[in-house]
């Protein structure tokens, strides 16, 4: 039995305020999880991540299995000791990374055989292998092994993919339990943009029984309105007493719209990857620091921001200079800023839900960007 506890503390519309409790710590929800693909959130230290307000991070099963390998991580007692992060960690199953190797993999009932992107060797990964890897990683939330349905996909392709994922979900559950792993195990709802397939996937997963439910296959190129429609379809069907995780999404607007539709957890490489490309998130939009208009701009990225980059007075002109010179300080400062922005956004949403003012918060969020607040179901624009 999992040692994860989830407490739903407040709701405002469909938005949910809650708390995840693990032996390694608590996570206030809705939460954003910084991505540490190789056991490190690129460019910053674990203690800096914690200081920004992050309480849980994500590790990548697929990449850590290939490099450095389970023996090295096992020597450290698991991923926490290896990465020097003492809070909860969620590990994905490797399914999405296998999905991204479209031309180098073969899917069968047993699992997936693919060419390693590191050395070209043939590697097999299935539900049992994924559960064994995540047991060695000793993550606090384990994800089932699934097939990520591509977009676009015909209903027949999406159905066959969803049914395969359900069979793999049962095998993941059996393997996880057989290993005596008391980490939380999350199911992943698939089915593309077909509501009936999403319902069937969720029904099947609930029949197996999981500690939380992720919504997969919604960061693969589908239009925003189709993603939101799937979240709206699933919200009343997902068990209220279990956490909900929207995988791989995304922009600040996506987080706000996901929370408005009942999502509790998010992850995305966007704040860190975009920082390395000179894109800095702010309450008024994105500062693209490579734009010539910032060459002599003496403002910080966002005046009043409490991140190290802004509170220390580093100007946009200076950051543009660092970026143009390929100085490593530029992505470090940008990453600190972007993650600070994301974590503050989540904290502000938690406070708004708790106080019953999420509608006003959402309206203010878009107004600061000079944008019209998109209507929710049942509202008129």
UniProtKB/Swiss-Prot annotation:
Keywords: Glycosyltransferase, Metal-binding, Queuosine biosynthesis, Transferase, tRNA processing, Zinc. Disulfide bonds: none annotated. Binds 1 zinc ion per subunit. Zn(2+) binds at residues 305, 307, 310, 337. It catalyses: 7-aminomethyl-7-carbaguanine + guanosine(34) in tRNA = 7-aminomethyl-7-carbaguanosine(34) in tRNA + guanine. One of its GO terms (cellular component) is cytosol. Its cofactor is Zn(2+). The active site is at 92 (proton acceptor), 267 (nucleophile). InterPro entries: ArchSynthase1/Queuine_TRR (IPR050076), TGT (IPR004803), TGT-like_sf (IPR036511), tRNA_ribo_trans-like (IPR002616). Pathway: tRNA modification; tRNA-queuosine biosynthesis. Gene3D superfamilies: Queuine tRNA-ribosyltransferase-like. One of its GO terms (biological process) is queuosine biosynthetic process. GO terms for molecular function: metal ion binding; tRNA-guanosine(34) queuine transglycosylase activity. Its EC number is 2.4.2.29. Residues 248-254, 272-276 are annotated as: RNA binding. Homodimer. Within each dimer, one monomer is responsible for RNA recognition and catalysis, while the other monomer binds to the replacement base PreQ1. Catalyzes the base-exchange of a guanine (G) residue with the queuine precursor 7-aminomethyl-7-deazaguanine (PreQ1) at position 34 (anticodon wobble position) in tRNAs with GU(N) anticodons (tRNA-Asp, -Asn, -His and -Tyr). Catalysis occurs through a double-displacement mechanism. The nucleophile active site attacks the C1' of nucleotide 34 to detach the guanine base from the RNA, forming a covalent enzyme-RNA intermediate. The proton acceptor active site deprotonates the incoming PreQ1, allowing a nucleophilic attack on the C1' of the ribose to form the product. This is Queuine tRNA-ribosyltransferase. The gene is tgt.
């Amino acid at each position: 039995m999992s040692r994860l506890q989830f407490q739903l503390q407040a709701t405002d519309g469909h938005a949910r305020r809650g708390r995840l409790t693990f032996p390694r710590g608590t996570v206030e929800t809705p939460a954003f999880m910084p991505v540490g693909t190789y056991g490190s959130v690129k460019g910053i230290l674990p203690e800096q991540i914690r200081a920004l307000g992050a309480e849980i991070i994500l590790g990548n099963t697929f990449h850590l299995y290939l490099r450095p390998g389970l023996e090295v991580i096992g020597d450290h007692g698991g991923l926490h000791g290896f990465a020097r992060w003492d809070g909860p960690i969620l590990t994905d199953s490797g399914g999405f990374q296998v999905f991204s190797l479209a031309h180098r993999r073969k899917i069968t009932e047993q699992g997936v055989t693919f060419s390693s992107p590191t050395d070209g060797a043939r590697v097999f990964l299935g539900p049992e292998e994924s559960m064994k890897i995540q047991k060695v990683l000793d993550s606090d939330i384990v994800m089932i092994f699934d097939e990520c349905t591509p977009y676009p996909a015909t209903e027949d392709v999406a159905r066959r993919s969803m049914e395969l994922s359900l069979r793999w979900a049962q095998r993941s559950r059996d393997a996880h339990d057989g290993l005596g792993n008391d980490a939380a195990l999350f199911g992943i709802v698939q089915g593309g943009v077909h509501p009936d397939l999403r319902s069937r996937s969720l029904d099947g997963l609930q029949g197996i029984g999981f500690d939380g439910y992720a919504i997969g296959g919604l960061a693969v190129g589908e239009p925003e309105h189709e993603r939101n429609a799937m979240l709206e379809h699933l919200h009343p069907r997902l068990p209220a007493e279990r956490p909900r995780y929207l995988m791989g999404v995304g922009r600040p607007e996506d987080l706000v719209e996901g929370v408005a539709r009942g999502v509790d957890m998010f992850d995305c490489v966007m704040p860190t990857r975009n920082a390395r490309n000179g894109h800095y998130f702010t309450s008024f939009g994105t500062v693209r620091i490579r734009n010539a208009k910032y060459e002599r701009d003496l403002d910080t990225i966002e005046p009043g921001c409490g991140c190290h980059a802004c509170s220390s007075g580093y100007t946009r002109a200076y950051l543009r200079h660092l970026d143009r010179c390929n100085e490593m300080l530029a992505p470090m400062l940008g990453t600190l800023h972007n993650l600070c922005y994301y974590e503050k956004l989540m904290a502000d949403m938690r406070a708004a839900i708790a106080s019953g003012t999420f509608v006003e918060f959402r309206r203010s969020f878009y107004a600061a960007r000079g944008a019209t607040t998109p209507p929710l179901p049942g509202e008129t624009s």
